[in-house]
Amino acid sequence: MNSEELWAQAKQLFAGGVNSPVRAAVKPFPFYVERGKGAYIYTVDGKKFIDYVLGYGPLILGHSPESVKRRIVEQLERGWLFGTPSELEIELARKIRSHIPSAQKIRFVNSGTEATMAAIRLARGYTKRSKILKFSGNYHGAHDYALVEAGSAATEYNVATSDGVPMEIMKTVEICEFNDLDCVDKKLRNEDIATVILEPVMGNAGVILPEKDFLFGLRELTKTYNSLLIFDEVITGFRISIGGAQSYYQIYPDITTLGKIIGGGFPIGAVAGKAEIIDNFTPAGKVFNAGTFNANPISMIAGIATIEELEKEYPYIIANQAAKTLVEELERLLKTKHTINHVGSMFQIFFGIDEVRNYSDAKRADKEYYIKFHERLLKEGVFIPPSQYETIFTSAAHKDDVIADTIDKLMKVIGELN
């Protein structure tokens, strides 16, 4: 069956035809992928795309890297779920702790959503406070406390504050704009906020960077008012550096949430932080967390194998240079008003606007022009996120020949749009 036929079936089986809403943003219907290798994905329709979505971030080595695949196959021969601890969870935790400065102890879960949900509960349990402070357009997963002025597909489908989130929960969530320290200072003064949670680099409203001293200011304010600081590094962890955004900016939170890359493309999440805080999780403490698939062997071995490759440094050299080259070429080629926010191997283009420093700015960008840009690139065999409010990623598989091919296609598309 081709993609159109599969889409017709999917609409009869799933709400909106998909199991995660951003997938429906590709028009007139999503294409269905049957395999991926390196920088490419291949559809059931026989089409080949250069992939800059990369599973929305986890695939920093590209699709199906041999070094990771081999270890997964070996583990499958031994078994994939036991309901007991395994040595693999110790090995992956040690690797994470060796690179993430704030990670004294770790609790593995199964997704970024689970990680932020557990981290918020942990912060409340530790501080004995009920409120949290988050930032407009920061996306921390699909649970109630996160779906208040959320980014990602929540913005794309105009449900930044989701139906079904009780008003009682909304009242426990304070909101500030990203990069606004004065707002944070005012909100924290009542000393009733358990935690300030943020993406240190916003990756779900496009890419939005922290301004100078913003992260430092948050660290100082949370210390002053006895609130915990949570960095949601589900996207940035092991991406903008092997030590994440906290190493890149040298600002260290009390709690870090991780996901995506640490599972090598398999479901995973983690809550990491100071031992005295993490030890409040059951069975050591009274903050409950559990999961049938927590620290499952397949996710553990995929994460170990991925980090082992990242420790060789070459993936960062290739992926970062690929992004840098693409950004430079886009700046050279684009004649329309725009801005590009970029760090490491992640970037996003905002059309019709000179600066994007927060969620309000991102929403003023020309979304319709971005959609045209996406659609024209898709016709040329280049897959970037279908939503303005996502991130363009590069990987270790995006080598010089792939980038040269992409630039040729960009020249054609931008020439037509200009």
From Swiss-Prot:
Gene3D superfamilies: Aspartate Aminotransferase, domain 1 (3.90.1150.10), Type I PLP-dependent aspartate aminotransferase-like (Major domain) (3.40.640.10). The modification N6-(pyridoxal phosphate)lysine is found at residue 260. One of its GO terms (cellular component) is cytoplasm. The keyword Cell division does not apply. Pathway: Porphyrin-containing compound metabolism; protoporphyrin-IX biosynthesis; 5-aminolevulinate from L-glutamyl-tRNA(Glu): step 2/2. The keyword tRNA-binding does not apply. Inhibited by gabaculine. It catalyses: (S)-4-amino-5-oxopentanoate = 5-aminolevulinate. Its EC number is 5.4.3.8. Pfam families: Aminotran_3. One of its GO terms (biological process) is protoporphyrinogen IX biosynthetic process. Keywords: Cytoplasm, Isomerase, Porphyrin biosynthesis, Pyridoxal phosphate. It is found in: Cytoplasm. Homodimer. NCBIfam families: hemL, PRK00062.1. Belongs to the class-III pyridoxal-phosphate-dependent aminotransferase family. HemL subfamily. This is Glutamate-1-semialdehyde 2,1-aminomutase. It comes from Saccharolobus solfataricus (strain ATCC 35092 / DSM 1617 / JCM 11322 / P2). The lineage of its organism: Archaea, Thermoproteota, Thermoprotei, Sulfolobales, Sulfolobaceae.
